[in-house]
From Swiss-Prot:
<keyword id="KW-1015">Disulfide bond</keyword>
<keyword id="KW-0166">Nematocyst</keyword>
<dbReference type="InterPro" id="IPR036880">
    <property type="entry name" value="Kunitz_BPTI_sf"/>
</dbReference>
<dbReference type="GO" id="GO:0005615">
    <property type="term" value="C:extracellular space"/>
</dbReference>
<dbReference type="InterPro" id="IPR050098">
    <property type="entry name" value="TFPI/VKTCI-like"/>
</dbReference>
<feature type="site" description="Reactive bond for trypsin">
    <location>
        <begin position="14"/>
        <end position="15"/>
    </location>
</feature>
<feature type="disulfide bond">
    <location>
        <begin position="13"/>
        <end position="37"/>
    </location>
</feature>
<comment type="function">
    <text>Serine protease inhibitor that acts on trypsin.</text>
</comment>
<dbReference type="GO" id="GO:0042151">
    <property type="term" value="C:nematocyst"/>
</dbReference>
<keyword id="KW-0722">Serine protease inhibitor</keyword>
<dbReference type="GO" id="GO:0004867">
    <property type="term" value="F:serine-type endopeptidase inhibitor activity"/>
</dbReference>
<feature type="domain" description="BPTI/Kunitz inhibitor">
    <location>
        <begin position="4"/>
        <end position="54"/>
    </location>
</feature>
<feature type="disulfide bond">
    <location>
        <begin position="4"/>
        <end position="54"/>
    </location>
</feature>
<dbReference type="Pfam" id="PF00014">
    <property type="entry name" value="Kunitz_BPTI"/>
</dbReference>
<comment type="similarity">
    <text>Belongs to the venom Kunitz-type family. Sea anemone type 2 potassium channel toxin subfamily.</text>
</comment>
<keyword id="KW-0964">Secreted</keyword>
<dbReference type="InterPro" id="IPR002223">
    <property type="entry name" value="Kunitz_BPTI"/>
</dbReference>
Length: 56
């Protein structure tokens, strides 16, 4: 879906939430640290959920 094409957005806050986003350049769900606010509409806590939604 189109949410899988959104870029990774860490956000300006300083929390530490391990998340996954779909990297459209590599075609893989990639880990990153989300700061806890002002992210995009799709970040996932679980690798398997990212893979299922984005078919990675």
């Amino acid at each position: 879906g189109s949410i899988c094409l959104e870029p990774k957005v860490v956000g300006p806050c300083t929390a530490y939430f391990p998340r996954f986003y779909f990297d459209s350049e590599t075609g893989k769900c990639t880990p990153f640290i989300y700061g806890g606010c002002e992210g995009n509409s799709y970040v996932d806590e679980k690798l398997h959920a990212c893979r299922a939604i984005c078919r990675a």
